[in-house]
């Protein structure tokens, strides 16, 4: 399944707020519609499916990519669900988003694809690049790169940066301090339901 490029508002109306996909918040429809929906019997499969879709759309990844992350998480030590979230959060495009250098993860991915971003002083143009503690993220020393990202930072750094990251406005430099903990995830998600969804596939 390819990466979603359709209307984002339609997705958040169905799944709830997905800050990585869009900064817009879902507007609830009339109470009569909500009540009729709540009265329907929702299957366990659908509940798991929707949690899985939240991860896919929030992080902007394909079905195949998510399944691959689940397989990696299963082989790692610790809680599969928590490891899965850590893998997704340490993607370069997500780190740029969480630092406030881009308004959304698709926006961060575009910065990476257009070679505006350096990791440890080297240009990295792979959005899925897995960052690690003590990696530092900087902007390519070009006026276009600095202008684009400076505008984003001025606006989006009013939101709190998670504890595992720091950003120096003076140096225009982001630092990954450590692997994040569960409380720092920027998404309302039940990762165990996602693991259960893939239990027969991973």
Swiss-Prot record:
<keyword id="KW-0934">Plastid</keyword>
<dbReference type="GO" id="GO:0009507">
    <property type="term" value="C:chloroplast"/>
</dbReference>
<keyword id="KW-0150">Chloroplast</keyword>
<dbReference type="Pfam" id="PF00163">
    <property type="entry name" value="Ribosomal_S4"/>
</dbReference>
<keyword id="KW-0694">RNA-binding</keyword>
<keyword id="KW-0699">rRNA-binding</keyword>
<comment type="similarity">
    <text>Belongs to the universal ribosomal protein uS4 family.</text>
</comment>
<protein>
    <recommendedName>
        <fullName>Small ribosomal subunit protein uS4c</fullName>
    </recommendedName>
</protein>
<dbReference type="GO" id="GO:0006412">
    <property type="term" value="P:translation"/>
</dbReference>
<keyword id="KW-0689">Ribosomal protein</keyword>
<dbReference type="GO" id="GO:0042274">
    <property type="term" value="P:ribosomal small subunit biogenesis"/>
</dbReference>
<dbReference type="InterPro" id="IPR002942">
    <property type="entry name" value="S4_RNA-bd"/>
</dbReference>
<dbReference type="GO" id="GO:0015935">
    <property type="term" value="C:small ribosomal subunit"/>
</dbReference>
<dbReference type="InterPro" id="IPR036986">
    <property type="entry name" value="S4_RNA-bd_sf"/>
</dbReference>
<comment type="subunit">
    <text>Part of the 30S ribosomal subunit. Contacts protein S5. The interaction surface between S4 and S5 is involved in control of translational fidelity.</text>
</comment>
<feature type="domain" description="S4 RNA-binding">
    <location>
        <begin position="90"/>
        <end position="153"/>
    </location>
</feature>
<dbReference type="Pfam" id="PF01479">
    <property type="entry name" value="S4"/>
</dbReference>
<dbReference type="GO" id="GO:0019843">
    <property type="term" value="F:rRNA binding"/>
</dbReference>
<dbReference type="InterPro" id="IPR022801">
    <property type="entry name" value="Ribosomal_uS4"/>
</dbReference>
<comment type="function">
    <text>With S5 and S12 plays an important role in translational accuracy.</text>
</comment>
<keyword id="KW-0687">Ribonucleoprotein</keyword>
<dbReference type="GO" id="GO:0003735">
    <property type="term" value="F:structural constituent of ribosome"/>
</dbReference>
<dbReference type="InterPro" id="IPR005709">
    <property type="entry name" value="Ribosomal_uS4_bac-type"/>
</dbReference>
<dbReference type="InterPro" id="IPR018079">
    <property type="entry name" value="Ribosomal_uS4_CS"/>
</dbReference>
<comment type="function">
    <text>One of the primary rRNA binding proteins, it binds directly to 16S rRNA where it nucleates assembly of the body of the 30S subunit.</text>
</comment>
<dbReference type="InterPro" id="IPR001912">
    <property type="entry name" value="Ribosomal_uS4_N"/>
</dbReference>
